[in-house]
Design a protein with these regions (language model features):
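Solvent-exposed adhesion/ligand-recognition segments of exported proteins
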Residues: 18-101, 121, 570, 595-664
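Feature marks extracellular polysaccharide-active and adherence modules
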Residues: 55, 84-86, 100, 107, ...
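Small-residue (G/S/T/A) turn/hinge positions that recur once per unit in extracellular repeat modules
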Residues: 79, 87-88, 102, 109-110, ...
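Extracellular beta-strand/loop-rich repeat segments of large surface/secreted proteins
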Residues: 53, 383, 434, 438, ...
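Extracellular, surface-exposed repeat architectures
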Residues: 65-116, 134, 213, 218, ...
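Sec-dependent, cleavable N-terminal signal peptides
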Residues: 1-23, 664
């Protein structure tokens, strides 16, 4: 019995010894067949429970005479090794590969079923190259730059037919800096998520997708600073979920570049595309496209994002299925060049919230958005939209808002156009409190076309300015009115230098309870399809002989309102009314002919219209409260047989100085 027990114990011990993992080492510096047991020390073929270390400091090639069965974990410590599997498959048996050697190249065949791939685990400069139509599959995670000392590690996936997949995702720069992933020359790379720069020590990493290559991932994140994603020469990157580029406040000086017919598509699962949470990040799209499906895009992703920049140029397209937002502080979006197109299925939001953000659309670029809002949120300040040099913005029948929630903001249309606007809201909607110091300017042939109402100023706010200047510059609404909000102060519209303001129905300058409001027309044209009124303490100035204001209905001055004509060297402009002149007691008429007097004087029509005779009369307060410059000018009021006024003119005496010639 005792002998039997000893025999059984010996049998169990031998079985356990046979099952114990063996630590193999590759021993051939000239390379060889992975299925040749003499290439290992101890001699034998590794199994799934064994480990293998490659630590010969030499250049050599590993081949396979057949499919390679599952090994245990593999560690490549030294040397430059080519893995040439031919048409065979190496099944890693759900074990890891660690690369600390300078170079491992898979040049043919398939390496599959890795649980994890770590490149530059504890040392710098390790690289993995997958090329020549081979296949590399990792069931877990791919990590490049595993600790803070493992810098300059990288993966290269190259050539048509070459594929690399990482089911557990990819981290380029897990802890170490200067890590890289390059996918080039028609290769394909896919993973669950792509992270560039994972912790604060992992900086200055780069992912390049070049020359017709493809990367498919679920989410894309950049978490540190100095990193880059470059997509170029007809390459394509798809992130089916969220894109968070420069994800934290510490993420600065990162770059996303899409070049030469390449594409970046994001957000198929309704996750946002957030770019530039931290400062000073740049996105450049050149002759390429970015599309964001079922979600929104933000530059300066919250109030902390500052100094970030987006440039879309040279015929590129930027298409977002939801809204586009430029927020945070001092962030900039620039869209330019013929063929460049911006499409948002929702609003373009500038400064919501934020300070000092700029969006410019120029040089014949085009945009289609469903509403524009500049400084919509409370606390937003000094945000800017510029549309210039033949650029076009179609607002698709939605509102254009400037300074509704925040102030000191600007919309400049400089030789560009904004069309198909529902309402224009400067500082606020009608009779709603708004903010101060906003500017709308339409210059150098710029055009703003609204379908409905144009509102200027908000209740109790002040110092908003509208300027329409230059030949070809037009502010027009098609079927409604333009008005100043009640009790707004110092809201001034300048119409200058051959510009046109064309209002479909009523024009109301100033509001009841307001003060300092004005419309100043200087050698330009204003048209109203219905009545014109000047309300509260407000001015209408008609400056220069090239100016005119025409209304097809009543022209009304309330108490304390002033109509002022100022001459140039040629004479005065005109107000042409299609119906009666209404003037409440206290309304004022000022006629300043100082300049035309110096050029010789003359007689000039000021108020004309075929139906004035119906309502003008000798007691009209306007013609009884007149200030004339020079004082010896003469107001000429022409009446019909019933003593109704039909014309108001002024005769200005000549104040031309004599010329003295001195002959020596």
């Amino acid at each position: 019995m005792k002998t039997r027990n000893v025999a059984m114990m010996l049998s169990v011990a031998l079985a356990a010894s046979a099952a114990r993992a063996v630590n193999y080492t590759w021993n051939s510096s000239s390379g060889g067949d992975l299925l040749d047991q003499t290439n290992y020390t101890p001699a034998g073929l590794p199994t799934a429970s064994d480990t293998v270390t490659y630590n010969i400091d030499a250049n050599y090639r590993l081949t396979a005479s057949g499919d390679v069965p599952s090994h245990g974990p593999q560690t490549f410590s030294k040397g430059e090794i080519e893995l040439d599997l031919g048409g065979h498959v190496w099944d890693a048996g759900s074990k890891y590969f660690y690369l600390n050697n300078p170079l491992l190249t898979l040049s043919s065949g398939m390496l599959t079923n890795l649980s994890q791939l770590v490149v530059s685990r504890t040392s710098p400069n390790a690289r993995l190259v997958v090329t020549n139509g081979s296949t590399f599959k990792v069931s877990g995670q791919v990590v490049v730059g595993n600790d803070a000392s493992s810098s300059h590690g990288g993966i290269v996936v190259a050539d048509e037919g070459t594929t690399f997949s990482a089911v557990g995702g990819t981290v380029i720069g897990a802890s170490g800096p200067f890590s890289a992933l390059t996918v080039s020359d028609g290769a394909r790379y896919s993973d669950a998520n792509l992270t560039i720069g994972n912790v604060t020590t992992a900086v200055s990493n780069i992912v390049q997708v070049l020359n017709g290559s493809t990367v498919d991932t679920v989410s894309l994140e950049v978490k540190t600073h100095g990193n880059a994603l470059i997509i170029s020469n007809g390459s394509h990157v798809t992130a089916s979920s969220a894109v968070n580029f420069a994800k934290a406040e510490t993420c600065s000086s990162n770059r996303l570049e899409v070049w030469a017919g390449s594409t970046l598509h994001a957000g198929a699962t309704k996750k946002p595309f957030a770019f530039g949470v931290g400062p000073d990040n740049v996105m450049l799209v050149d002759a390429s496209s970015i599309s964001v499906a079922d979600t929104y895009f933000t530059l300066g992703a919250d109030a902390t994002g500052s100094g970030n920049r987006l440039d879309v140029r040279n015929g590129s397209s930027f298409h977002v299925d939801s809204w586009i937002a430029c927020q945070g502080s001092f962030n900039e979006m620039h869209f330019s060049d013929p063929g460049t197109e911006i499409v948002s299925e929702s609003q373009l939001l500038i400064g919501q919230p934020g300070v000092g953000n700029v969006v410019s659309i120029g040089n014949q670029a085009s945009a289609s958005v469903f509403g524009v809002s500049i400084s919509y949120s409370a606390g937003s300040q000094s945000n800017v939209l510029e549309v210039a040099d033949g650029a076009r913005v179609d607002v698709n029948g939605k509102d254009l808002q400037i300074g509704v929630g925040g102030g000191a903001s600007r919309l400049t249309i400089d030789g560009g156009s904004i069309t198909n606007v529902l309402t224009v809201q400067m500082a606020a909607k009608r009779n709603v409190a708004g903010k101060d110091n906003n500017l709308l300017e339409i210059v150098n042939g710029g055009r703003l076309f609204a379908n409905s109402t144009v509102y200027f100023g908000g209740v109790g706010n002040s110092n908003n300015v509208i300027r329409v200047a230059g030949a070809g510059s037009v502010l027009k609404n098609h079927d409604s009115y333009m008005s100043w909000a009640s009790s707004s102060t110092n809201t001034v519209m300048y119409v200058e230098d051959a510009a046109l303001v064309d209002i479909a129905t009523t024009l109301a300058i100033g509001g009841a309870g307001g003060s300092g409001n004005a419309m100043i027309v200087s050698n330009a044209t204003v048209k109203a399809g219905n009545a014109v009124s000047v309300n509260g303490v407000a001015n209408l100035d008609i400056i220069g002989s090239g100016s005119s204001l025409t209304t097809s209905s009543d022209f009304t001055l309330t108490a304390d309102a002033t109509l002022r004509f100022v001459s140039d060297d040629e004479g005065f402009g005109k107000v042409v009314s299609g119906n009666r002149l209404n003037a409440t007691e206290g309304a004022k008429l000022v006629i300043d002919g100082a300049r035309v007097a110096k050029s010789g004087g003359g007689t000039f029509e000021l108020l004309v219209g075929p139906e004035l005779a119906k309502q003008y009369n000798t007691s009209n307060p306007l013609v009884n409260n007149v200030t004339l410059v020079p004082e010896d000018s003469e107001l000429i009021v022409t009446r019909d047989a019933k003593q109704n006024i039909v014309n108001v003119s002024v005769r200005v005496p000549s104040k031309r100085s004599g010329i003295v010639v001195i002959v020596r």
